[in-house]
Every structure is written in structure tokens, then in C-alpha cells.
A protein has these predicted regions:
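A short, well-ordered alpha-helix in the C-terminal region of glycosyltransferases
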Residues: 327-339
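Acidic donor-binding loop of glycosyltransferase active sites
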Residues: 93-95, 247, 255-268, 276-277
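Conserved nucleotide-sugar phosphate-binding/catalytic loop shared by glycosyltransferases and other
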Residues: 3-8, 30-76, 157, 308-310
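C-terminal alpha-helical cap of glycosyltransferases
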Residues: 321-324, 338-355
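Active-site-proximal region of nucleotide-activated glycan assembly enzymes
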Residues: 35, 112-175, 180-183
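Donor-nucleotide binding loops and adjacent catalytic segments primarily
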Residues: 44-46, 173-179, 183-259, 292-295, ...
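An amphipathic, basic-hydrophobic alpha-helix
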Residues: 66-95, 113
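C-terminal "capping" alpha-helix adjacent to the active site of nucleotide-linked donor transferases
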Residues: 301, 306-327
């Protein structure tokens, strides 16, 4: 029995896919029987490094603006769908999970004349184009937010997160986390986390916060490409400002902080699962207004404050206000927290796949 997972492109698709793969293995599926497909981007590094079989496809995503490359897209998708069909036959695939993005469409098309069920997982409060299209013949769509617009046959389970966060205990990890980062015990800690697309702007926010000489420590995950320059600025700052390029033990980052300033992609599931209040700066990049939809959904519960990229001067005041309300905001995260999402999806896939 093989389960095929189509998750590619950005970390917002790749890491939830990996979380489901790890949950399947935890439930007894042999790792060689959890096969990932994608392009030659982040997924081509992440899945093999985690020990999973990975089969690259020659494909590309749709550009939202008029671009000559879009003219070739139908032929590219057809070729990729034929490649997926061969994988389905050669591997005796029992069920397929697509996590949106450009790889989901050829995977879904390959199933249209086969008795193999398709499941989808949507990471955002507003469904992406690929999942909206593929949901027309999916058995079920697992959503990260309740009442996700644009999808039929949806079931709210939450966004799959890493195993290290699914049983997160801040009080138990806090002393280890503070020692890990070298953080003093006498101040609150504000985490500033920039993803691959948002790092430059979030790093400017970290600089802005440091310039206010705050009564808190800044823990800045700057991204590998920005870490050296941020560390240089932090060394010259008069405020406590700790810089890391990347943190493999992400549970220690969340355990160390009292508040996160970050983007609002699918990673918001990590904020709610770890009961971390947030000041969210939604990005305007990518497909549609997904980050704004996510940010509004979290803010509606009282777990986050939201500010646009055009109003970054408001961030220090919002951080001050959020720290003063952090107990109430942390409690509000429970409204959306679904730390068992990866296991729930894995169990549903196994039930469908049968013995």
C-alpha cells in the first residue's frame, strides 16, 4: 500500500505535507510507502532529507499576471499528469493527498479515470486556485480554518504542524529555550520571524523595534541570507537583540517568546498550537489575499493584532499593547488550535486506503 502526497513550492505547502508523512509513519506505515511528488524547489531538498521517497516532476505554476510561460502551461500540466499516472500504476497507490499549489492539479487530473480517491488539504482561510479546482472531484477537503470559502465537502481539522509542536509545553521547555538562545530571565521576549519571502521586511521591523530601546528582548529569526547583516546591527544596538539565521528546533523558538511578529501564511497554525499571541503583517505576494484572510480569521478570535505593510510605524505600539494583553490573547488561540491535524488527516487516509 502506497500513499502519494503532492506538496510543493513554498514551505506553506511543503512542511504540512511533511507533517502528514511523519504522522503516517508514526501510525505504522513504512516510510518507503509514503511517496512525495513535486518540482525541483524546496520540496526536492526537504523530503529526501527526511528520508522519504521523492519523485520530481517537470512542471511550473501559473503566473497571475499575463506571461508568455502561461501559454505552455496546459501542455506542461498534461505531461506531468501522465507522469503521475505512471507513478500511480507502478507504485499501486491506494490514495492521494494534495496540499494545493501547482503540483496538485496534475496529481488530481491523473486520478480522473482511476478508482484512487483524492483528498486535499487547504492551508489558508481563503482557498487557493488549485484546491478550488481540484475540490470538484475530491472525496474530502481538510481545512485549516472553519468555513473556508470556495470549497465543497470540507472538514475543519487544522493545518498539519511539526510533531515537535503538536504536544507543545511552553512551561516545560522555557528554561531550556532561554538557555539555548542565551536570553536573560528578567524580560519578556518578542520573536520576529521572517520566512523566505518576508524576511527582509520582518528584519526591518526588528531593527525598528530595537531602535525604540524596548523593555523586552528581541529574538530575530532573520533567514540565512540576512543573518550576518542583522547580527552586525544587533551587536551595535543598545537593546537586547538576538539573531539567528534559522532554527531547526522551532519548538524552542516558540517556548522562548511571549509574542511573535510575523507574516500570516499557513504558519499561523504554529502560533495557535503554541498559544503564542501575534502581531501579524500580511504579505501581498503570492496568490490572492490568503494572508489577509488568515490574519483576519486569527484576529477575530482575539489572538492577534494586524497591521499592513504600509503602516509599519504602528508596530512598536502594537507590540507594547499585545504584551500587555498577552495572557488574554494566548487564551484566545484555543479557538483555532488543532495540534492533532496531521494525525487526523493521516488516520483518514489510512481508513480510506484500507489494510
Amino acid at each position: 500500500m502506497t500513499i502519494l502526497i503532492a506538496a510543493a513550492g513554498t514551505g506553506g505547502h511543503v512542511f504540512p505535507g511533511l507533517a502528514v508523512g511523519e504522522a503516517l509513519v508514526a501510525l505504522g506505515v513504512a516510510q518507503d510507502n509514503v511517496v512525495f511528488i513535486g518540482g525541483r524547489r524546496l520540496e526536492a531538498e526537504v523530503y529526501p532529507a527526511a528520508g522519504f521517497p521523492f519523485i520530481p516532476l517537470e512542471l511550473a505554476g501559473l503566473k497571475r499576471r499575463m506571461a508568455p510561460s502561461n501559454l505552455a502551461l496546459p501542455a506542461v500540466v498534461r505531461r506531468a499528469a501522465r507522469a503521475v499516472a505512471r507513478i500511480l500504476d507502478e507504485r499501486s497507490v491506494a490514495t492521494v493527498l494534495g496540499l494545493g499549489g501547482y503540483v496538485t492539479v496534475p496529481a488530481a487530473l491523473a486520478l480522473r479515470r482511476r478508482p484512487v480517491p483524492l483528498y486535499l488539504a487547504e492551508q489558508n482561510a481563503q482557498a487557493g486556485l488549485a484546491n478550488r479546482f481540484c475540490s470538484l472531484w475530491a472525496e474530502r477537503v481538510f481545512t485549516s480554518f472553519p468555513h473556508t470559502a470556495g470549497l465543497k465537502r470540507q472538514e475543519w481539522v487544522g493545518n498539519p504542524i511539526r510533531e515537535s509542536l503538536s504536544a507543545f509545553d511552553r512551561s516545560a521547555l522555557r528554561p531550556i529555550a532561554k538557555q539555548h538562545f542565551g536570553i536573560p530571565d528578567d524580560q519578556p521576549v518578542v520573536g520576529v520571524m521572517g520566512g523566505s519571502l518576508g524576511a527582509a521586511l520582518l528584519n526591518r521591523v526588528a531593527q525598528q523595534l530595537a531602535n525604540t530601546k524596548p523593555a523586552y528582548t528581541i529574538l530575530n529569526l532573520a533567514g540565512p541570507a540576512h543573518a550576518h547583516e542583522q547580527a552586525r546591527l544587533a551587536a551595535a544596538a543598545s537593546s537586547p537583540w538576538i539573531v539567528r539565521g534559522f532554527e531547526t528546533r522551532i519548538e524552542l523558538f516558540y517556548a522562548a517568546i511571549d509574542l511573535v511578529v510575523a507574516r500570516a501564511g499557513g504558519v499561523v497554525a504554529e502560533y495557535t498550537a503554541t498559544a503564542t499571541p501575534a502581531v501579524l503583517i500580511p504579505g501581498g505576494f503570492g496568490s490572492g489575499e490568503h494572508q489577509w484572510a488568515n490574519a483576519r480569521a486569527v484576529a477575530k478570535t482575539g489572538a492577534a493584532m494586524v497591521v499592513s505593510e504600509d503602516e509599519l510605524e504602528r508596530v512598536p505600539a502594537l507590540v507594547h499593547d499585545a504584551l500587555g494583553q498577552r495572557a488574554e490573547m494566548a487564551a484566545a488561540t484555543a479557538t483555532l488550535a488543532r495540534p492533532r491535524a496531521a494525525l487526523d488527516i493521516a488516520e483518514a487516509l489510512l481508513k480510506e486506503a484500507g489494510p
